[in-house]
Amino acid sequence: MNTVADNIVSLRPDPVAGQAIGEILVATGRLSLRDAQRVAAEQRRQGQKFGEAAIGLKLLTREDLDLALSRQFEYSYLNVRDTSRSAELIAAYQPFSQVAESLRALRSQLMLRWLQTNPAHKAIAIVSAGSGDGRSFIAANLAIVFSQLGQQTLLIDADLRDPRQQALFMPEKSAGLSAVLAGRSGLEAAVAVSGLANLRLMPAGASPPNPQELLGRPAFSALLQDAAAEFDVIVIDTPAGCDYADAEIVARVARAATLVTRKNQSLLSEAASLARRLQDSGVTLVGAVLNDA
C-alpha cells in the first residue's frame, strides 16, 4: 500500500463523524488516493485548508465539500445529484436555502412551545383543512430538520387515503402503518432513510377500506407510546381535515397539531373551523404555517 497516501487517509468502510475531511472524501469516492495526495501537497504548498486546495485544483466542487463537511459534523443532507428521492425534500437537498431556514424557525417554535415543555410531549400531527395545502411537504421537511438537529425522529404517514411520504422518500419496502394498526406488524415497520441519519419513516402501507376505523383503534395510541420510548420527536402526516375525520383522530392521540395553510388557496373559514374542532377535542395547536413553497 502507498505509505505516502497512508499519511493522508485512513481507509474505513463508511464515513463517520469525526473523520478528517480527506478521509471522508476518499471513503465516499469523491477523491481517489492519488488525488488526495495531490491535494495534501497543494495544501502544504499554499497553506490552505484541504477542501479549499481540492477546489483550487478543480478536483472537487463546493457542493462536494459542503456534503463532506456535513458528514464530518453529523449534519446530514443529500447530494443534489442523488435523484432517487423527491426534490420536494428541500431540507435535505437545499439545507441552506431560505425555505430550509424557515423550517428551522418552525422547528424552534415547536420545541419551545411543546416538545421541551414536558418530557411526554413527543408527537405532533401536521394538519390542514384542504387538499393541496402542503401538509406532506411540511411533515417531511420538518422531520428532516429535526433529524439534522440530532433528534431521533420518526415520520409516520397516517394519511391512509392518499399517502405521499413513500413517494417522497422512496424507502426500503415496509409493511407500513396500516399493517401495524391491523396487528400484523410493529415498530419495525419504521425504516431508516438512507443518507439522513437519525430519521426513520413509517409509510402508510397498503390502503385499507376502513382507514378511520383503523386509526381509531387502541393500536394507534399504543404505537405512539412505543415510539415515544425510542424517539425524541414523532411527526405525523394526516389527510385533509375538512374531507375526513381522520386528522382529528390522529391529532387527539398525538395531543398536539400544527396547522398548515397555503397562500392564495386555503379558505380561512375552513382552517378556522378545523382549528376550533381540534381545540374542542383537547388538542394543543402549536404553530401555524403559511405555506408559500
Show where each model-derived region lies.
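P-loop NTP-binding module
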Residues: 2-46, 57-79, 83-293
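Helix-loop-beta junctions that constitute the ligand-sensing/allosteric loops
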Residues: 47-51
